[in-house]
């Protein structure tokens, strides 16, 4: 899988569904993120595979892996590639009138050390990753 992805872009699709129990209202959203993989060497790939990390990952990689760094020039939702697109979740929760006391996009970017170029657009309702 990682040899196939090497040097190419692919898309990660992450779907969300939140059910409000008191009125059974279901709100769904979909995040599609373009992921440009870098041209890592066979040696880097072998070292990463030997860690065992790719064995339980969709796509066989963790974008946040501290040693491998499989992705370059990311321009989409980093959190989505990790598994939970937080801005999309906020958008769903707002639709359900759930108020949050935390600036989730700022907290996400601070935690991930990633300046997200799409968070504002997502929160405006645009369909981008």
Range-by-range predicted roles:
Residues 1-129:
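Anionic-ligand binding patches
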């Amino acid at each position: 899988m990682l040899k196939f992805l090497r040097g190419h872009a692919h898309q990660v699709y992450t779907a969300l569904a939140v059910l409000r129990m008191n009125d059974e209202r279901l709100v769904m959203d979909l995040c599609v993120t373009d992921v440009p993989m870098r041209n890592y060497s066979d040696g880097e790939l072998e070292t990463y595979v030997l860690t065992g990390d790719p064995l339980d990952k969709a796509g066989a990689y963790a974008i946040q892996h501290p040693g491998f760094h499989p992705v370059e020039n990311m321009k989409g939702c980093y959190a989505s590639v990790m598994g939970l697109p937080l801005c999309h979740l906020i958008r769903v929760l707002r639709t359900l009138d759930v108020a949050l006391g935390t600036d989730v996009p700022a907290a996400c970017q601070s935690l991930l050390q990633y300046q997200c170029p799409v968070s504002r657009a997502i929160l405006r309702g645009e369909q981008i990753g």
